């Protein structure tokens, strides 16, 4: 065997040993270690995000063992990241927030993932570079402390693992892999990716969501894992499903999606698209077209195929219990499988009219009936390829979270779950009292939701203090700044009160003095710096 072949074989064996570690006990890969090694370069690169990924895995493993959650929120900037580091274990980077505040094109907009694909990775880098800087700054400051000062000054872990929003992957499988590579290079410990179609992606709490087939999303998850493996990192992937509230799907090609696709049960209706094209040709627009579509949908009596089969069997005289058994038997079967079972096992004589093509939209999408059962079905299909599973929901309903967790854990015991504590929910109108709200994240933790996050808390907290301060500053001038900001910073011990020190001026002085032999007449924090005023109230 040539030395090149021997080196290749040795690396393959190393990857195979790596995959047998507890870290990947629940991970399924449809490719081999040789596939991975053949796609690597000859220079081994060590990525800081791998350290962060391992740290995140260890953190969540401990929470899973204890039935507790790690909860966080979406950070906008380095200021928020440094303040979060004192109290929270992870950092979230939101695509929604990036879309409105940090697009790499500088063009803001809603959460449609129509910003350049490097937008969220760039925000991750922005925050990760700040984490690294404040970690260095702290270490330098502690190196100058006495033993007593060290003992009385808690260490802040600025290097909190970052989990970021990969939307739908921004394109095909190679686009997903390139996006994943950017996230690894920029410092993300993990990413989440959702099962929406890329061209029509919406915020999880908007209408009009279009799903992709189950296998298409599995392919995305596999692409992420493959890219991780090629780079030799243990970063995490979160599989999100938007199927709880989805109403459309791009294709009926995947048998596993069949039970949730709706069809027309009215044989007298022409296809909806034909009706709409004809109406447009007649000059109808806007509300007129919407009324025509609404009327067609009502007349079509859309049903899932198991429902149509159940009605047909009942019409043929079957008992209620027999019909219920049929529904239970075919509820997760493909269309041809359901027909075969209904005929052979239940004696159905006539297959009912049921047409899933007739209601298709002008874009060609199929009508889809989402819900919690659907989300469980999809999550269970994604589980072997993801580290965590997330069902996007419309409201903070603990009973629904319990149903989802039970449905997943019945198939995949111990599977880690994630939960969006969304600010899109009207929490005050959710039927939760103050005690319920305080306990919510910990109750979810008991169910296996080991990682939870408020996607836009950074945005909302920023908006809140900005509005409050601007309003009062306009009326009362510096009194507003002192009362709402400076005195409150001092009261809670916020380190940004002394913003020169927070920004690293002492650290920069130390760098300069290291270069110049310990003396600098231009030290930023020398005599005359106004920050010395903050040693006491004026």
From Swiss-Prot:
Its main location: other. Pfam families: ICL. The keyword Cell membrane does not apply. The keyword Lipid metabolism does not apply. GO terms for biological process: glyoxylate cycle; tricarboxylic acid cycle. SUPFAM superfamilies: Phosphoenolpyruvate/pyruvate domain (SSF51621). It catalyses: D-threo-isocitrate = glyoxylate + succinate; (2S,3R)-3-hydroxybutane-1,2,3-tricarboxylate = pyruvate + succinate. Keywords: Glyoxylate bypass, Glyoxysome, Lyase, Magnesium, Metal-binding, Peroxisome, Tricarboxylic acid cycle. Catalyzes the formation of succinate and glyoxylate from isocitrate, a key step of the glyoxylate cycle, which operates as an anaplerotic route for replenishing the tricarboxylic acid cycle. Required for growth on ethanol or acetate, but dispensable when fermentable carbon sources are available. Also acts on 2-methylisocitrate. This is Isocitrate lyase. It comes from Coprinopsis cinerea (strain Okayama-7 / 130 / ATCC MYA-4618 / FGSC 9003).
